[in-house]
Amino acid sequence: MDFSSCNNHYFYDVDMKEDFYRCIAPSEDIWKKFELVPGFPLSSGGCPGGGGTDWAAEMMDLGWESPVKLTGLSSVVLLRDCMWSGFSTRERLEKVIHERLSTGSPRVTNTQKPVADNETSEPGVDSIEQNATPLVVPTPIPEKVPNSSGSESTSDSEEDEIDVVTVEKRKSYGGRQPVTITVRADPTATKLFHISIHQQQHNYAARLPPEPNTMSPQHNFHSTVKEEPGEVTSPPELQPCSPQMPDSPLASGSSDSEDLAKRKNHNYLERKRRNDLRSRFLALREEVPSLSRSTKTPKVVVLSKATEFLKGLVIQEQQLTAEKLKLWSRHQQLLRRISQLKGR
């Protein structure tokens, strides 16, 4: 196989020598180089067993207008070459392909099924894709990914590596089950807890919790009497009743006398206010010329006539002040005239 033609078609611009997909160390963040480039889908048909150059020729005939359509073998090889810096030489790639084609044991085919269930292709292609699946598809446990990637260059047999990856996946699936059970159980418990708090805080129609029964003062008094029997000589019930019997008529008589005094004072003040108001209206009626001779006049009529008379007085006052100013000016003119006559 010759992958140089594929590399020329994969890069965007070879003339400008823009090395977007240079090989980097595994410790660096390689995903930054592939953020804007979509991944290549793995075809289900696979590539033919012996024609390694047919897929490269077909890929070159597509042109830049259509996206690159790669088979399962080519996509896996390119992804491993570009992403993980593996299979950088042609000899190592051919060696691996020949090993997979020659050693097609049933153990390898059995381990391929849990990893790639949906892919159906030839045995040689399946072996190469199975070799690349632990590198392209990350396992659920992140600690196991560097182990599978580092085992490519150090391990002697690739079949053991595939078995380890499948066992790790099964273990990870088995370990996820209790986690999902606990996660499903937590929200229900929290919801019930919040509902109970909400009902306790906002259920205003509910009855209050029963309060502790407070002891009556009579019961407390009996308890104190029982504790100190030597100090009490007479029954306590008769002491407050004996002075209240003779004092009850005196208290009622004093309250009645206070009410009578308040009523008398109120009546006196009310009569005084009415007499003062009547005398004021009579004086106002005497001041109004049109009502001075009438003996019985309603208060409303007295007020209306008084306001009219007051407005008339205001107008007369304004007229008199204007006339006064005119007379004062005339007086000043006469004084000047007298002074002029004396000067001659």
Curated annotation (Swiss-Prot):
**Signal sequence, renumbered to the chain:** none
Which GO BP terms apply? regulation of transcription by RNA polymerase II
Q: Where in the cell is it found?
A: Nucleus
Tissue-specificity statement = High levels in oocytes, modest levels in kidney and low levels in spleen.
PANTHER family per the UniProt record, alphabetical: MYC PROTO-ONCOGENE
- Where do Polar residues bias regions lie? 104-113, 213-223
**One example GO MF annotation:** RNA polymerase II cis-regulatory region sequence-specific DNA binding
List residues of the bHLH domain: 261-313
Question: Composition bias, kind Basic and acidic residues: at what positions?
Answer: 259-270
Q: Which SUPFAM superfamilies match?
A: HLH, helix-loop-helix DNA-binding domain (SSF47459)
Q: How does it assemble?
A: Efficient DNA binding requires dimerization with another bHLH protein. Binds DNA as a heterodimer with MAX.
UniProt lineage? Eukaryota, Metazoa, Chordata, Craniata, Vertebrata
Supply one GO CC term from the record.
nucleus
What's this protein's name?
A: Protein L-Myc-1-B
- Region ranges (Disordered): 104-162, 208-271
